[in-house]
Amino acid sequence: MENRYSVHPEQVKRFTTEELRSHFLMDSLFTENKLTMYYSHEDRVVIGGAAPGQSELKLDAGDFLKTDFFLERREIGIINVGQPGAVRVGDDEYVLQTKDFLYIGMGNQDVSFSSLNGEKAKFYFVSACAHKSYPTQKAALSELTPDRLGDDAASNVRSLYKVIHQDGIKSCQLMMGITMLDQNNNWNTMPAHVHDRRMEAYLYLDLEKDSKVFHFMGQPDETRHLVVGNEQAVLSPAWSIHSGAGTSNYSFVWAMAGENYTFTDMDLIPMDGLK
Protein backbone atom coordinates (compact mmCIF):
# COMPACT_ATOMS: atom_id res chain seq x y z
CA MET A 1 0.00 0.00 0.00
CA GLU A 2 1.32 3.42 -0.97
CA ASN A 3 0.88 6.40 1.35
CA ARG A 4 -0.52 9.65 -0.05
CA TYR A 5 -0.15 12.39 2.53
CA SER A 6 -2.29 15.52 2.69
CA VAL A 7 -0.84 18.62 1.05
CA HIS A 8 -1.62 22.26 1.85
CA PRO A 9 -3.01 24.26 -1.11
CA GLU A 10 -0.34 26.92 -0.64
CA GLN A 11 2.29 24.26 -1.30
CA VAL A 12 0.46 22.91 -4.36
CA LYS A 13 0.70 26.32 -6.05
CA ARG A 14 4.44 25.74 -6.47
CA PHE A 15 4.35 22.11 -7.59
CA THR A 16 5.94 20.96 -10.82
CA THR A 17 4.01 18.64 -13.13
CA GLU A 18 5.76 15.59 -11.69
CA GLU A 19 5.07 16.70 -8.12
CA LEU A 20 1.38 17.12 -8.92
CA ARG A 21 1.27 13.66 -10.47
CA SER A 22 3.12 11.99 -7.61
CA HIS A 23 0.73 13.41 -5.01
CA PHE A 24 -2.63 13.23 -6.77
CA LEU A 25 -2.52 10.75 -9.68
CA MET A 26 -2.88 6.98 -9.29
CA ASP A 27 -1.73 5.63 -12.63
CA SER A 28 -1.14 1.90 -12.04
CA LEU A 29 -4.21 0.49 -10.33
CA PHE A 30 -4.62 -2.69 -12.36
CA THR A 31 -1.71 -5.13 -12.55
CA GLU A 32 -2.70 -8.71 -13.35
CA ASN A 33 -2.66 -11.06 -10.34
CA LYS A 34 -2.07 -8.16 -7.98
CA LEU A 35 -3.90 -6.04 -5.43
CA THR A 36 -2.83 -2.37 -5.62
CA MET A 37 -3.80 0.12 -2.92
CA TYR A 38 -3.23 3.76 -2.03
CA TYR A 39 -3.84 5.11 1.47
CA SER A 40 -4.94 8.73 1.31
CA HIS A 41 -4.75 10.89 4.41
CA GLU A 42 -7.65 12.88 2.94
CA ASP A 43 -10.46 11.47 5.11
CA ARG A 44 -8.47 8.22 5.51
CA VAL A 45 -9.78 6.58 2.36
CA VAL A 46 -8.14 3.59 0.71
CA ILE A 47 -8.33 3.52 -3.09
CA GLY A 48 -7.38 0.37 -4.91
CA GLY A 49 -7.58 -2.01 -7.81
CA ALA A 50 -7.71 -5.80 -8.02
CA ALA A 51 -6.96 -7.64 -11.26
CA PRO A 52 -7.35 -11.36 -10.47
CA GLY A 53 -5.98 -13.88 -12.96
CA GLN A 54 -6.31 -17.63 -12.46
CA SER A 55 -6.60 -17.43 -8.67
CA GLU A 56 -8.46 -15.33 -6.13
CA LEU A 57 -7.05 -12.14 -4.68
CA LYS A 58 -7.82 -11.61 -1.01
CA LEU A 59 -8.62 -8.13 0.29
CA ASP A 60 -5.74 -7.77 2.70
CA ALA A 61 -3.63 -4.81 3.82
CA GLY A 62 -1.15 -6.79 5.89
CA ASP A 63 -0.31 -4.84 9.04
CA PHE A 64 -0.71 -1.44 7.38
CA LEU A 65 -4.09 -0.69 8.98
CA LYS A 66 -3.10 -2.25 12.33
CA THR A 67 -6.36 -4.22 12.45
CA ASP A 68 -7.09 -7.94 12.40
CA PHE A 69 -8.74 -7.68 8.97
CA PHE A 70 -9.35 -5.03 6.33
CA LEU A 71 -13.01 -4.24 7.08
CA GLU A 72 -12.74 -4.44 10.86
CA ARG A 73 -13.41 -0.70 11.08
CA ARG A 74 -14.09 0.08 7.43
CA GLU A 75 -16.70 -0.13 4.68
CA ILE A 76 -16.00 -0.54 0.98
CA GLY A 77 -17.58 0.20 -2.39
CA ILE A 78 -16.54 -1.88 -5.41
CA ILE A 79 -17.19 -1.62 -9.15
CA ASN A 80 -16.10 -4.11 -11.80
CA VAL A 81 -14.57 -2.13 -14.67
CA GLY A 82 -13.33 -5.21 -16.55
CA GLN A 83 -14.85 -8.45 -17.79
CA PRO A 84 -17.22 -10.56 -15.64
CA GLY A 85 -15.93 -11.42 -12.20
CA ALA A 86 -17.03 -12.29 -8.69
CA VAL A 87 -16.51 -10.99 -5.18
CA ARG A 88 -16.74 -13.48 -2.33
CA VAL A 89 -17.90 -12.13 1.02
CA GLY A 90 -17.71 -14.89 3.61
CA ASP A 91 -19.77 -17.78 2.20
CA ASP A 92 -21.62 -15.58 -0.31
CA GLU A 93 -20.51 -14.90 -3.88
CA TYR A 94 -21.61 -11.86 -5.88
CA VAL A 95 -21.17 -12.00 -9.66
CA LEU A 96 -20.47 -8.56 -11.12
CA GLN A 97 -20.83 -7.79 -14.80
CA THR A 98 -19.07 -4.76 -16.26
CA LYS A 99 -19.92 -1.62 -14.26
CA ASP A 100 -21.91 -3.48 -11.60
CA PHE A 101 -21.39 -2.24 -8.03
CA LEU A 102 -21.10 -3.96 -4.66
CA TYR A 103 -21.16 -2.40 -1.20
CA ILE A 104 -19.74 -4.36 1.75
CA GLY A 105 -20.28 -3.14 5.29
CA MET A 106 -17.99 -3.04 8.28
CA GLY A 107 -17.13 -6.30 10.01
CA ASN A 108 -16.97 -8.66 7.03
CA GLN A 109 -13.74 -10.55 7.50
CA ASP A 110 -13.21 -12.66 4.36
CA VAL A 111 -13.42 -10.78 1.05
CA SER A 112 -11.79 -11.91 -2.19
CA PHE A 113 -11.88 -11.11 -5.90
CA SER A 114 -11.88 -13.54 -8.84
CA SER A 115 -12.31 -13.59 -12.61
CA LEU A 116 -14.86 -15.91 -14.23
CA ASN A 117 -14.40 -18.42 -17.04
CA GLY A 118 -10.98 -17.20 -18.10
CA GLU A 119 -12.15 -13.59 -18.36
CA LYS A 120 -10.16 -10.66 -16.97
CA ALA A 121 -12.12 -8.85 -14.30
CA LYS A 122 -10.88 -5.54 -12.89
CA PHE A 123 -12.26 -4.37 -9.60
CA TYR A 124 -11.89 -0.76 -8.50
CA PHE A 125 -12.66 -0.04 -4.87
CA VAL A 126 -12.81 2.81 -2.38
CA SER A 127 -12.91 2.19 1.36
CA ALA A 128 -13.71 4.62 4.16
CA CYS A 129 -13.77 4.41 7.94
CA ALA A 130 -17.05 3.19 9.41
CA HIS A 131 -18.85 3.18 12.75
CA LYS A 132 -21.75 0.84 11.93
CA SER A 133 -22.30 -2.26 9.80
CA TYR A 134 -24.68 -1.85 6.88
CA PRO A 135 -25.83 -4.85 4.78
CA THR A 136 -23.81 -6.04 1.81
CA GLN A 137 -25.70 -5.09 -1.34
CA LYS A 138 -25.17 -5.41 -5.08
CA ALA A 139 -26.38 -2.92 -7.70
CA ALA A 140 -26.45 -3.99 -11.34
CA LEU A 141 -25.97 -1.08 -13.73
CA SER A 142 -28.70 -2.49 -15.99
CA GLU A 143 -31.23 -2.08 -13.16
CA LEU A 144 -30.35 1.52 -12.29
CA THR A 145 -32.05 4.65 -13.60
CA PRO A 146 -29.65 7.55 -14.21
CA ASP A 147 -30.19 11.27 -13.96
CA ARG A 148 -29.83 12.81 -17.43
CA LEU A 149 -27.85 16.03 -17.22
CA GLY A 150 -26.20 18.64 -19.44
CA ASP A 151 -26.88 19.95 -22.93
CA ASP A 152 -25.28 19.86 -26.37
CA ALA A 153 -24.32 23.54 -26.28
CA ALA A 154 -22.11 22.94 -23.24
CA SER A 155 -20.73 19.62 -24.58
CA ASN A 156 -21.62 17.88 -21.32
CA VAL A 157 -24.61 15.59 -21.95
CA ARG A 158 -24.22 12.73 -19.51
CA SER A 159 -25.87 10.03 -17.41
CA LEU A 160 -25.28 10.22 -13.66
CA TYR A 161 -25.74 7.00 -11.70
CA LYS A 162 -25.88 7.51 -7.93
CA VAL A 163 -25.36 4.10 -6.32
CA ILE A 164 -24.05 4.29 -2.75
CA HIS A 165 -25.68 7.34 -1.18
CA GLN A 166 -28.38 8.50 1.21
CA ASP A 167 -31.28 7.51 -1.05
CA GLY A 168 -29.66 4.37 -2.51
CA ILE A 169 -27.41 1.75 -0.95
CA LYS A 170 -26.89 2.92 2.62
CA SER A 171 -23.42 3.41 4.11
CA CYS A 172 -21.78 5.23 6.98
CA GLN A 173 -20.06 7.96 4.98
CA LEU A 174 -19.02 6.52 1.61
CA MET A 175 -20.77 7.78 -1.52
CA MET A 176 -20.07 6.26 -4.92
CA GLY A 177 -21.42 6.17 -8.46
CA ILE A 178 -20.53 6.56 -12.11
CA THR A 179 -21.06 9.26 -14.72
CA MET A 180 -21.05 8.38 -18.43
CA LEU A 181 -20.72 11.07 -21.10
CA ASP A 182 -22.61 10.76 -24.38
CA GLN A 183 -20.71 10.59 -27.64
CA ASN A 184 -19.39 13.98 -28.82
CA ASN A 185 -19.48 15.34 -25.26
CA ASN A 186 -16.33 15.91 -23.23
CA TRP A 187 -16.82 18.19 -20.20
CA ASN A 188 -17.55 17.00 -16.66
CA THR A 189 -18.35 19.03 -13.55
CA MET A 190 -18.21 22.42 -15.23
CA PRO A 191 -19.22 24.89 -13.85
CA ALA A 192 -17.00 23.55 -11.09
CA HIS A 193 -17.61 23.16 -7.38
CA VAL A 194 -15.85 22.27 -4.16
CA HIS A 195 -17.15 20.60 -1.00
CA ASP A 196 -14.98 21.54 1.94
CA ARG A 197 -16.57 18.82 4.06
CA ARG A 198 -15.41 15.80 2.04
CA MET A 199 -12.77 14.58 -0.38
CA GLU A 200 -13.44 12.93 -3.74
CA ALA A 201 -11.71 10.56 -6.13
CA TYR A 202 -12.28 10.10 -9.86
CA LEU A 203 -11.42 6.98 -11.87
CA TYR A 204 -11.50 7.72 -15.60
CA LEU A 205 -12.75 4.93 -17.90
CA ASP A 206 -13.77 4.07 -21.46
CA LEU A 207 -10.92 5.99 -23.07
CA GLU A 208 -9.11 4.69 -26.14
CA LYS A 209 -5.34 4.29 -25.93
CA ASP A 210 -4.61 7.64 -27.57
CA SER A 211 -7.35 9.56 -25.75
CA LYS A 212 -6.77 11.64 -22.63
CA VAL A 213 -8.70 13.65 -20.09
CA PHE A 214 -7.36 16.98 -18.90
CA HIS A 215 -8.38 16.92 -15.24
CA PHE A 216 -8.55 20.34 -13.60
CA MET A 217 -7.72 20.66 -9.92
CA GLY A 218 -6.58 23.21 -7.35
CA GLN A 219 -8.25 26.11 -5.62
CA PRO A 220 -10.66 27.95 -7.95
CA ASP A 221 -8.32 30.92 -8.33
CA GLU A 222 -5.18 28.73 -8.66
CA THR A 223 -6.13 25.93 -11.04
CA ARG A 224 -3.75 23.27 -12.29
CA HIS A 225 -4.25 20.24 -14.52
CA LEU A 226 -3.29 16.58 -14.81
CA VAL A 227 -3.25 14.67 -18.10
CA VAL A 228 -5.01 11.39 -17.30
CA GLY A 229 -5.32 8.16 -19.27
CA ASN A 230 -7.71 5.23 -19.22
CA GLU A 231 -8.17 3.46 -15.87
CA GLN A 232 -6.20 6.10 -13.99
CA ALA A 233 -7.54 7.82 -10.89
CA VAL A 234 -7.16 11.25 -9.30
CA LEU A 235 -7.37 12.27 -5.65
CA SER A 236 -9.26 15.49 -5.02
CA PRO A 237 -8.79 17.18 -1.62
CA ALA A 238 -11.72 19.02 -0.09
CA TRP A 239 -10.30 22.40 -1.13
CA SER A 240 -9.88 21.46 -4.80
CA ILE A 241 -12.14 21.68 -7.80
CA HIS A 242 -12.46 18.46 -9.79
CA SER A 243 -13.43 18.82 -13.40
CA GLY A 244 -12.27 17.48 -16.72
CA ALA A 245 -12.37 17.73 -20.49
CA GLY A 246 -11.55 14.79 -22.71
CA THR A 247 -10.26 14.39 -26.25
CA SER A 248 -13.25 12.03 -26.60
CA ASN A 249 -16.19 11.06 -24.45
CA TYR A 250 -15.50 8.88 -21.41
CA SER A 251 -16.90 7.66 -18.10
CA PHE A 252 -15.69 8.27 -14.57
CA VAL A 253 -16.35 6.58 -11.25
CA TRP A 254 -16.68 9.09 -8.45
CA ALA A 255 -16.41 8.38 -4.74
CA MET A 256 -16.62 10.68 -1.74
CA ALA A 257 -16.11 10.45 2.01
CA GLY A 258 -15.99 12.92 4.85
CA GLU A 259 -18.11 15.07 7.12
CA ASN A 260 -21.40 15.38 5.25
CA TYR A 261 -23.51 12.58 3.74
CA THR A 262 -25.69 14.87 1.63
CA PHE A 263 -24.96 14.46 -2.09
CA THR A 264 -26.02 18.02 -2.93
CA ASP A 265 -23.71 19.60 -0.34
CA MET A 266 -21.39 21.54 -2.62
CA ASP A 267 -20.23 25.11 -3.10
CA LEU A 268 -20.64 26.15 -6.73
CA ILE A 269 -17.91 28.23 -8.35
CA PRO A 270 -19.05 30.86 -10.88
CA MET A 271 -17.18 30.79 -14.18
CA ASP A 272 -15.63 34.19 -13.51
CA GLY A 273 -14.27 32.81 -10.23
CA LEU A 274 -11.92 30.43 -12.04
CA LYS A 275 -8.36 31.40 -12.86
Curated annotation (Swiss-Prot):
One of its GO terms (biological process) is D-glucuronate catabolic process. Induction: Induced by galacturonate and negatively regulated by the KdgR repressor. Is subject to catabolite repression by glucose involving the ccpA gene. It catalyses: 5-dehydro-4-deoxy-D-glucuronate = 3-deoxy-D-glycero-2,5-hexodiulosonate. Its EC number is 5.3.1.17. Signal peptide: none annotated. Its cofactor is Zn(2+). Keywords: Isomerase, Metal-binding, Zinc. Pathway: Glycan metabolism; pectin degradation; 2-dehydro-3-deoxy-D-gluconate from pectin: step 4/5. It is an enzyme of class 5 (isomerase). Binds 1 zinc ion per subunit. It comes from the Bacteria. Zn(2+) binds at residues 193, 195, 200, 242. GO terms for molecular function: 4-deoxy-L-threo-5-hexosulose-uronate ketol-isomerase activity; metal ion binding; zinc ion binding. Belongs to the KduI family. Catalyzes the isomerization of 5-dehydro-4-deoxy-D-glucuronate to 3-deoxy-D-glycero-2,5-hexodiulosonate. NCBIfam families: PRK00924.1. This is 4-deoxy-L-threo-5-hexosulose-uronate ketol-isomerase. It comes from Bacillus subtilis (strain 168). The lineage of its organism: Bacteria, Bacillati, Bacillota, Bacilli, Bacillales.
